[in-house]
């Protein structure tokens, strides 16, 4: 009977997460009012540049990491895009809490609305530069099996890394006492994109800067500040239960 109760509770939480995620989310700031990354970020490294030579070296590093079964499994898990409850779960140990719509509604609302604000920033830059991805250039397979979804979409900047570093910035603002753990996890999350061959290192590096630009824009939004305070209050209450 206990197992059935636990299963039902888990199903309720999962259903709540899906319903919350599927609901239309109004961003804190419209895309038109957000900083234009295409006007800020430089072009990705040219193929004959020293910076691209480093990208190739880092691509080789990423392939070496695939020999580590634990690290490559983490990189594959980090590739999750659609299920946000699974996405946030990647920071559970660092943050100290599992984030979901049912149990942490204020934190969930902050994260979902923030991502709805910053995620779209990447699209114009990707389309403008149309950079070829590593697995495309080297005609390689990906351990995360994302080839069909990613082929033909610009590599620069990395959407996963923009999102992952943005999540780290938000969680560190909620729980500054855990910032070191949170950013360490975020750093590895971003590097997972190099390991699976989805992105060049320079894509990932640029995305950390892009995420910081989006995060700074959020700080000037009164609605964001209000929701951040609610999330911080909820976090403190949950951690002291």
Predicted regions and their residues:
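Bacterial N-terminal signal peptides that target proteins for export
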Residues: 1-6
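Bacterial N-terminal signal peptides
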Residues: 7-16
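Alpha-helical transmembrane segments and their juxtamembrane interfaces
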Residues: 12-13, 170, 213
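Residues in and immediately flanking transmembrane alpha helices
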Residues: 15-16, 173, 216
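Boundary at the C-terminal end of the N-terminal hydrophobic targeting segment
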Residues: 18-20
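Hydrophobic alpha-helical bundle signature of multipass membrane enzymes
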Residues: 22-196, 220, 227, 238-239
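Alpha-helical transmembrane segments that form the membrane-embedded catalytic/substrate-binding core
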Residues: 160-164, 197-234
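Short amphipathic alpha-helical segments
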Residues: 233-241
């Amino acid at each position: 009977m206990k197992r059935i109760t636990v299963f039902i509770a888990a199903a309720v939480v999962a259903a709540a997460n899906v319903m919350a995620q599927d609901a239309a989310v109004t961003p804190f700031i419209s895309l038109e009012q957000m900083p234009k990354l295409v006007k800020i970020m430089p072009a990705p490294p040219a193929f004959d540049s020293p910076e691209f030579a480093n990208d190739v070296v880092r691509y080789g590093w990423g392939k070496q990491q695939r020999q580590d079964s634990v690290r490559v499994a983490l990189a594959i898990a980090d590739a999750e895009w659609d299920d946000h409850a699974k996405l946030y779960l990647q920071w559970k140990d660092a943050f100290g809490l599992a984030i979901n719509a049912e149990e942490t509604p204020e934190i969930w609302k902050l994260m979902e609305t923030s991502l709805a604000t910053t995620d779209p920033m990447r699209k114009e830059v990707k389309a403008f530069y149309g950079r070829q991805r590593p697995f495309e250039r080297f005609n390689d397979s990906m351990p995360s099996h994302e080839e069909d979804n990613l082929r033909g979409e610009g590599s620069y900047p990395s959407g996963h890394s923009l999102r992952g570093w943005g999540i780290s910035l938000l969680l560190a603002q909620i729980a500054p006492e855990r910032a070191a753990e949170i950013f360490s996890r975020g750093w590895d999350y971003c590097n997972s994109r190099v390991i699976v061959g989805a992105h060049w290192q320079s894509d990932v590096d640029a995305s950390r800067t892009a995420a910081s630009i989006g995060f700074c824009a959020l700080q000037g939004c009164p609605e964001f500040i209000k929701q951040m305070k609610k999330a911080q209050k909820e976090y403190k209450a949950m951690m002291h239960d």
